[in-house]
Amino acid sequence: MTDDKFHDECGVVGIFGADNAARLSYFALTALQHRGQESAGIAVSDTGIASSEGAKISLCKDMGLVGDVFSTEHLQKLSGNISVGHVRYATAGGRTIENAQPFLNSFKNGSIALCHNGQLVNHAELRAQLEDGGSTFSSSSDSEVILKLIVRKYIENGGKLGSPNTGGKSAEENRKRFIDAVVQTAGLIKGSFALCIMTENMLIGVRDPNGIRPLCLGEIYGGVAGVSPAQGVESNEVRTQGELAASPNGRSFERTPPSFTSYIIASETCAIDAVNGKFLRDLEGGEIVVVTKEGLSSIKYAQEKKRTCIFEYVYFARPDSVIDGISVQNARYRMGEVLARESSVEADVVIGVPDSGIGAALGYAKASGIPYVTGIIKNKYIGRTFIAPTQAERESMVFVKLNAIKSDLEGKRVIVIDDSIVRGTTSRRLVQLLRKAGAREVHFRVSSPPVKFPCYLGIDTPSKAELISSTHELESIRKEIGADSLAFISLKGMLEALGADTFCKGCFNGEYPV
């Protein structure tokens, strides 16, 4: 980690049925940039819908932000109507171009591209098994393990490499075998995973049984070559894995080709908004959605045990996203309201640490009756990828990223709301920043409970020994950061704000769903 925050591993997107699929993936990835800033990539099938004959998948990926990796020329070369895209922040696997996604597996006459958000807990075991069977790897990423496992299962199912996209009955049989390979793989991998997978003529989304990482489905009006969407009728029937071999159409939107809507699968609803799409629903935990030119199919490969990462609502997700029916902005606002009720203090102004602390600060101000002021400005041009080689330089980065508005703070008793305290280094620098701006008192309030345990399911976290709340009591932390008072929201209060208790709370209580 290069600063005192948790980082999500990745953002994923898949587009099906749009002439400019790569460009739409670019827009969607830009909306998901907050989920990963180390690398970006897009894969596209050039003729996947109109004709699978001779179709191929092209790939462009590199280190850096979306806007740095892709030029207009890149996007023009990525021509096609099926696409997957990825932004990455590493947890499993190093920060190298070899681990950038999408991963592509090419055969004689066919290819598979895969994007993954999350982290497997059994990837080392699976990798060893695959290597014993002759598989080779080009990266240290657990995501490549998923891709190689799908290929292995496809071959074991009788699928023919190089012929899944030829016409006739054999092609349909191979498509069924490939979907079954994805179902089998999803049942073998353990941990957190939200996947976007594509072949030359198919897009697949997969969400793990606990739904730890978010994944949602939307539609983009226009379809191929601007065709208007057909009126589809949704069937409520959902096929099991055993029934899949008999019929690939589970919950489907029956449409008459070629009049169909373009579809998008993405980590957050903000990506659907970025391509002017319409949100349809979240994928359920343990669900696979298959998109072909015939429409949508849904396969329930495992029973849902909903445990969405609670930190999506605290910090990771964009405030304009809605995850599993809960508005991120509203959740943060309600956390602030509860925090004000639980930890009131006399003060003159309330401020929020940009960006994820602002929603909670607004809620705190409303509930407490204390005025909200801006107080802190964030430098928008400092990326999260800045690597400071020493701890002292990392701590000093807060003065580059943030600056105080003296007229808002001078002579005031200030309540500052942040989303979390991880190591405590950023919090200490924030208090120094506010006092330097003339704040008479600084009362630190945190809209999440104390982070006491590391995450093993797709978040870049320090070791337990580096987490200040695991080694210090509340008063000790207050002294360490230099605040006049310090309080965290309770876990009970946080769940009250969210209106549910269907979350992974491992970083707070050490209890993990996997």
Give short role names for the model-derived ranges.
Residues 1-222, 258-284, 290-347, 353, ...:
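Conserved short alpha-helical segments that host acidic/polar catalytic motifs at enzyme active sites
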Residues 51-52, 163, 228, 235, ...:
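Serine residues within intrinsically disordered or low-complexity segments
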Residues 70, 139, 144-149, 372-383, ...:
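A conserved beta-strand->alpha-helix junction
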Residues 159-165, 223-230, 235-242:
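Intrinsic, low-complexity polybasic segments
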Residues 201-202, 276-282, 301-303, 432-514:
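PRPP-dependent phosphoribosyltransferase catalytic core
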Residues 350, 357-364, 368, 372, ...:
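Extended, hydrophobic alpha-helical segments in both membrane/secreted and soluble proteins
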Residues 369-415, 425, 452-460:
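Short, glycine/charge-rich flexible loops or terminal/linker lids adjacent to PRPP-binding catalytic cores
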